UniProtKB/Swiss-Prot annotation:
<feature type="short sequence motif" description="Q motif">
    <location>
        <begin position="96"/>
        <end position="124"/>
    </location>
</feature>
<dbReference type="GO" id="GO:0016887">
    <property type="term" value="F:ATP hydrolysis activity"/>
</dbReference>
<dbReference type="GO" id="GO:0005730">
    <property type="term" value="C:nucleolus"/>
</dbReference>
<feature type="domain" description="Helicase ATP-binding">
    <location>
        <begin position="127"/>
        <end position="306"/>
    </location>
</feature>
<dbReference type="InterPro" id="IPR014001">
    <property type="entry name" value="Helicase_ATP-bd"/>
</dbReference>
<dbReference type="GO" id="GO:0006364">
    <property type="term" value="P:rRNA processing"/>
</dbReference>
<dbReference type="InterPro" id="IPR050079">
    <property type="entry name" value="DEAD_box_RNA_helicase"/>
</dbReference>
<dbReference type="InterPro" id="IPR014014">
    <property type="entry name" value="RNA_helicase_DEAD_Q_motif"/>
</dbReference>
<dbReference type="InterPro" id="IPR027417">
    <property type="entry name" value="P-loop_NTPase"/>
</dbReference>
<dbReference type="Pfam" id="PF00270">
    <property type="entry name" value="DEAD"/>
</dbReference>
<dbReference type="InterPro" id="IPR011545">
    <property type="entry name" value="DEAD/DEAH_box_helicase_dom"/>
</dbReference>
<feature type="region of interest" description="Disordered">
    <location>
        <begin position="1"/>
        <end position="77"/>
    </location>
</feature>
<keyword id="KW-0547">Nucleotide-binding</keyword>
<keyword id="KW-0067">ATP-binding</keyword>
<keyword id="KW-0694">RNA-binding</keyword>
<dbReference type="GO" id="GO:0003724">
    <property type="term" value="F:RNA helicase activity"/>
</dbReference>
<keyword id="KW-0539">Nucleus</keyword>
């Protein structure tokens, strides 16, 4: 039997119809009117009438406003990630959310206010397990959101019983501690939460008063917190005995042995806290070292669940973001400063925010003074500076008041400055893991970035070790129409840079700051 006429009018096809279509239209025109149905629910008194199966529309003209049909995704499967390499950089699929991880609504709202709407891979893996009370060792590349991975469950568990010092966060550098302090304050803004920052370079008396006031979370560097434990008295640090959660951020650096080790101070801090059987311990790092992995097998009390360990993109193939371009530039030892000046002045790099990493504080101090005389907008971050000046310089760089930050490895860990698109290794790092952390200051959270390493004749073995660590080879730096050697010869850059360097060294010998002001207590750099 022929198909009934649909209740909606059929658009007339302006093109030639097939023979099958003509037959179909002929049958429709000769059908008895009583056989027509205006809707599926219409009643028909003729029992012999049987509704046929619907046929596809005959017209090729679509109704206005009808959206194009899209193939449905298979049942139980999330929509595919649209960004190439999204999984590699730690971003999640569109269907994921913090609410699905059992995060409290007030925290979801706070994260949304901060434009953090979807959890990354490390956050999705760790947050549910931490909320269950498990100790955690989390490894994920730089810029993947490890701070939120431990801050959110800490704040959620604190909100259930907001009394006394609930958590302690230890981190190796003052700048990273300040950044974590500010992020925790922002996330906990809807609640009356009191964090406190305990770092070196500032007066201990206000810090002791703040500790005695029983803040809810303490963010500290190990050295300064250990000083308070040893010298500030029992009344000041007795609140630490009730801590329920401890976080070691950049755990590989905190637990490293050898010269400059922070391990003795970390042990002092942990000795003032409850035993491991009575608290939750979280370790996060971008480079999971054997010292960190060994903690998984340490003896545990019978009533504690096993340690949760996750390593997301921390092996050789994943330690460097896929959006990072790695290059090297061969430079002679005697003209390294001149090559750097020309490199910063090329058409592609002249306006890019950049961080220049040095191995020594004296090199960073000299480079800042020299580049300032060469008209670059530059500031610095290293241990020769007082803490107030370090904070001010970092704030200037974040606000784009300075385009270039010359720094030692104090700036290589944890600092999140989204505008940085270029990292220059003026000195090749001796440890390949330090290279991973340095170049991690750019190409964060899926953004693009470039890392350029200045390589001298004595640095070849160091570069090979770095390439083996990251699993990728560096390409030789090049820019269309740019020859650094040619510019050095033609433009007289060597003389200009030499004069700027001599003036900078003279300023250091006279004990003046970068603005030329006399400072009696300024350390001389020779």
């Amino acid at each position: 039997m022929a198909s009934p006429v649909p209740s909606e009018p059929v658009s007339e096809d302006t093109h030639d119809s097939s023979s099958g279509s003509e037959v179909e239209q002929s049958e429709i025109s000769t059908r008895a009117p009583k056989r027509r149905r205006l809707s599926e629910s219409s009643d028909d008194s003729d029992d012999s009438y049987v509704a046929p199966a619907p046929l596809p529309t005959l017209s090729r003209i679509k109704k206005k406003g009808a959206p194009d049909a899209k193939p449905a995704a298979p049942a139980g499967q999330d929509n595919p990630v649209l960004i190439r390499d999204a999984l590699e950089i730690g971003l999640r699929e569109e269907a994921s959310s913090f609410a699905a991880l059992n995060v409290a609504p007030w925290l979801v709202g706070s994260l949304t206010t901060m434009a953090v709407r979807k959890p990354t891979a490390i956050q999705k893996a760790c947050i549910p397990e931490i909320l269950k009370g498990r100790d955690c060792i989390g490894g994920s590349r730089t810029g993947s959101g490890k701070t939120i991975a431990f801050s959110v469950p800490m704040l959620q568990k604190w909100a259930e019983d907001p009394f006394g010092i609930f958590g302690v966060v230890l981190t190796p550098t003052r700048e990273l501690a300040l950044q974590i302090f500010e992020q925790i304050k922002a996330i906990s803004a809807p609640q009356s939460m009191k964090p406190v920052l305990i770092t070196g370079g500032t007066d201990m008396r206000p810090q002791a008063i703040a500790l005695a006031g029983r803040p809810h979370v303490v963010i500290a560097t190990p050295g300064r917190l250990a000083d308070h434990i040893k010298s500030s008295g029992e009344d000041t640090v007795c609140g630490l005995k009730r801590v329920r959660m401890v976080v070691l951020d950049e755990a590989d650096r905190l637990l490293a042995s050898g010269p400059g080790s922070m391990l003795p101070d970390v042990e002092t801090c942990l000795s003032a806290l409850p035993p491991s059987s009575e608290r939750q311990t979280l370790l996060f790092t971008a480079t999971v070292t054997p010292e960190v992995r060994a903690l998984k097998n340490m003896p545990r009390s019978a009533n504690k669940p096993p340690v949760f360990v996750t390593e997301i993109s921390t092996e050789n193939q994943g330690s460097i973001p896929p959006t990072l371009k790695q290059t090297y530039l061969k430079v002679p030892l005697t003209h390294r400063e001149a090559f750097l000046h020309v490199l910063l002045s090329t058409e592609d790099n002249a306006s890019r925010p950049a961080i220049i990493f040095c191995n020594h504080t004296k090199t960073a101090d000299l480079l800042e003074r020299m580049l300032r005389r060469l008209t670059h907008r530059v500031t610095s971050l290293h241990s020769l500076l007082p803490q107030s000046e370090r904070n001010a310089n970092l704030a200037r760089f974040r606000a784009s008041a300075a385009r270039i930050l010359v720094a030692t490895d104090v700036a290589s860990r944890g600092l999140d400055i989204p505008t940085v698109s270029l990292v220059i290794n003026y000195d090749v790092p001796r440890n390949p893991d330090d290279y991973v952390h340095r170049v991690g200051r750019t190409a964060r959270a899926g953004r693009s970035g470039e890392a350029i390493t200045l390589v001298g004749q004595r640095d070849v073995q160091l570069v090979l070790a770095i390439e083996e660590r990251v699993g990728r080879q560096m390409e030789e730096w090049s820019e269309e129409g740019v020859s650094i050697e040619g510019r050095l010869v033609r433009t007289g850059v060597l003389k200009e840079v030499g004069e700027a360097k001599r003036e900078a060294m003279g300023e250091i010998d006279e004990g003046r700051d970068v603005l030329g002001r006399k400072r009696n207590k300024l350390k001389k750099v020779r």
